[in-house]
Amino acid sequence: MPRATALGALVSLLLLLPLPRGAGGLGERPDATADYSELDGEEGTEQQLEHYHDPCKAAVFWGDIALDEDDLKLFHIDKARDWTKQTVGATGHSTGGLEEQASESSPDTTAMDTGTKEAGKDGRENTTLLHSPGTLHAAAKTFSPRVRRATTSRTERIWPGGVIPYVIGGNFTGSQRAIFKQAMRHWEKHTCVTFIERTDEESFIVFSYRTCGCCSYVGRRGGGPQAISIGKNCDKFGIVAHELGHVVGFWHEHTRPDRDQHVTIIRENIQPGQEYNFLKMEAGEVSSLGETYDFDSIMHYARNTFSRGVFLDTILPRQDDNGVRPTIGQRVRLSQGDIAQARKLYKCPACGETLQDTTGNFSAPGFPNGYPSYSHCVWRISVTPGEKIVLNFTSMDLFKSRLCWYDYVEVRDGYWRKAPLLGRFCGDKIPEPLVSTDSRLWVEFRSSSNILGKGFFAAYEATCGGDMNKDAGQIQSPNYPDDYRPSKECVWRITVSEGFHVGLTFQAFEIERHDSCAYDYLEVRDGPTEESALIGHFCGYEKPEDVKSSSNRLWMKFVSDGSINKAGFAANFFKEVDECSWPDHGGCEHRCVNTLGSYKCACDPGYELAADKKMCEVACGGFITKLNGTITSPGWPKEYPTNKNCVWQVVAPAQYRISLQFEVFELEGNDVCKYDFVEVRSGLSPDAKLHGRFCGSETPEVITSQSNNMRVEFKSDNTVSKRGFRAHFFSDKDECAKDNGGCQHECVNTFGSYLCRCRNGYWLHENGHDCKEAGCAHKISSVEGTLASPNWPDKYPSRRECTWNISSTAGHRVKLTFNEFEIEQHQECAYDHLEMYDGPDSLAPILGRFCGSKKPDPTVASGSSMFLRFYSDASVQRKGFQAVHSTECGGRLKAEVQTKELYSHAQFGDNNYPSEARCDWVIVAEDGYGVELTFRTFEVEEEADCGYDYMEAYDGYDSSAPRLGRFCGSGPLEEIYSAGDSLMIRFRTDDTINKKGFHARYTSTKFQDALHMKK
């Protein structure tokens, strides 16, 4: 989020904020030695965050800044008085940058409609901005921490030594991880802040996909891990860099006490309920560290942040001397002001820098003309993990003293001044080359004597590969997360403690693809040398499976050629123990199976794991070869037990098909069947063709396998249990499997028999098998399907006239898309041709007459019917055409006195509405009449603010008209009437849960009648 460059934004408010003590419902302070390895998995991340300083559990939010109860006490905010409930759909937590404001202004989204989502039981998000108590009262313009200024007494909010340990949650992709690392390297490059992978540090940040969008606390919270939320649409470089600004200790720039001298807040343009985001801090309680107001700060809001409309300003910069208004809200890079503030906040040395290139050099200030007295410089050399740094001093002339007490250059093997010392140097003797054990070096120069020398000059080079003799670490391709360099060859020899194995897991993988990995590749071998057994030769974009060596050594080689370069790879290695080799075999009753980082127990055939995951009990499921029988959930007819996994494999004779009919069905579950479920597949393997995953209380339809095998799997979780299910299976011979059942065209298997069908343009002979040429008038009422010219795919016959009358569900337009088209060519299509009409017959307006070999563009009717007529003359014949008919929702509807129907989707009644639906209907009545809309059925995914799926009604022709309401759940409680002659209906769905939809009826009505009925 933007920052208050103020020291109170950075020091008084940052350093004065007390440490949280269980604020926001957090758990007890975790042990400093706690193991957070669970963060490698998504579920582990979410569970561990229950015990974190979680910004999504903050008392309130100030923009994307999380404030806890102690912050409120510091600001003297009485929640009951100063905070009010959120009353409108919130925009959600964004950083207020330019790119976000642009992305939030899609054509069909109003300023009041946008929102982020908060997770429910199924991990989905719900639209909300603030947790209770809500937003700051709009009347409040400033707030003040009325405590004595203590710039140095609250250092617990500053990260010690500028070192910020981090963990990246396991639910992020490789590209997202790369963005996080690029943003951290950006901060390191321009400041003296350092980000390190967390080992055993007590306080650290966790990149997590949280429910509150983009948000973070300001500064170090202390007492354990704290989350930095990178939620939906937050995984952009500038947004992550902005959030890291909060972690470093920055508030929003526009909240500085002196902001009114530089910008104007236009309050009438601010979305209702968002006024608190524009509060400012009080002068006298904060300090700006001597830095001027920074329009260019990455911590500044954009001009239209939280605006009622995209083109309305909420923050207007004042004109400069040339009459130009500065640009604000950039999310591209740190500004010079950001850099200066951070360097002051963390007391960065006046000289020195962070060096991140593969090669580079640096020297003492003034070299070779002499360095000044009392100089202090620090160079932080940081290359890609898995690389080492070779440092060479080529010139050395420093005042020499005993133990190099006065003037010296010091090199440490790590990221800070507490790292192991490689050497302290003075005098004129050039040191031997120094080599780091990892990817960082700390070089510090100090002078305190009055006798000065020329100084020193040093050059460094990153070398990839080498020996990695430790129990855990990280290896990345050179220059990761940026593209690796050409013509590289890196060899790593990993050795962990005796008695352990080497475990290797990949976080990201993107190496130039080739079928045999001939160009760029990563090679992994099970041992210490190139002659060791090959584990894998990897390239492409899929992460390799986890690797486990058979000894305590592993050999890796990365090679790139001279051309195409990709992002490369990032991998973690660690010591791995085989728990199954222990005397008790891990406590497993039957079999122990070692896994990377852990182990699991398994049971012999006919048994399954008990609830303790170690003991075995008689299994449910089994291998069934009977032609018919019954399958029930374990414990039937009582409730099934928790943590069960049952698999039935049903096998019938060849040429048979298996049908499964559920008689009783009652499982825990919601629409996504995440908890308890039954899966049915055609085949015996767990990845065979899936017919469906079922849960809840709705009985599935009869399922028929595609072969003579069927797999039925039942799973229950560790919580709610229900009655379960009872199903009957029966096998039937598939007469179509041999010689197509004797059918000339298509054979369709039915239970106990079969039937023949004919292709388009033919009808079934009375013998039930042969097909004869049929008449050519077709009526089509299916939602989608294929139609073709007669005799397709062969040439159409001469002297034929065929018609197709296509009708669709009320409120849905017919769409026709041609896959192939070849009809005798004529300039005016006078011979053979296809005509399309916008209605039910040839009296409707014509949409076009077509011939030749150019496919007509996809055509959409204005209503729910389309008429086609194909004509061929006596001479030339061609291949003809094939087209797909489908439907599109929305359009213009005419309201009349006679009642008409409107359905949410074309398959209403047969299937739930589809995901990502975008439908707008405009219903228009005659002059002097209004529109009356009543709902016969309404079942749309329910959410407090209708932020997922919803139906909206507007009193006019488009969304600029007054909105009559947004509805979800069970819908409107009464009829909807327009005040004018038109009504717009908008239907939107998201990408997950789908419901039945709605069925509405509309008619025209006199205005006075409608008003009377409303009364």
From Swiss-Prot:
Sites of Omega-N-methylarginine modification: 963, 966
Organism: Homo sapiens (Human)
Top-level taxonomy: Eukaryota, Metazoa, Chordata, Craniata, Vertebrata
Region Disordered, annotated ranges: 24-49, 88-130
CUB domain boundaries: 351-463, 464-576, 620-732, 776-888, 889-1005
Residue ranges of the propeptide: 26-149
Gene name of this polypeptide: TLL2
GO molecular function: calcium ion binding; metalloendopeptidase activity; serine-type endopeptidase activity; zinc ion binding
Lineage: superkingdom: Eukaryota
Keyword match Manganese: no
Places the protein is found: Secreted
Glycosylation sites noted in the Swiss-Prot or TrEMBL record: 171, 361, 392, 628, 805
Ranges annotated as biased composition (Basic and acidic residues): 115-125
GO cellular component entries: extracellular region; extracellular space
Known function: Protease which specifically processes pro-lysyl oxidase. Required for the embryonic development. Predominant protease, which in the development, influences dorsal-ventral patterning and skeletogenesis.
Cofactor: Zn(2+)
Any matching Pfam family: EGF_CA
Cofactor note: Binds 1 zinc ion per subunit.
Protein's name in the database: Tolloid-like protein 2
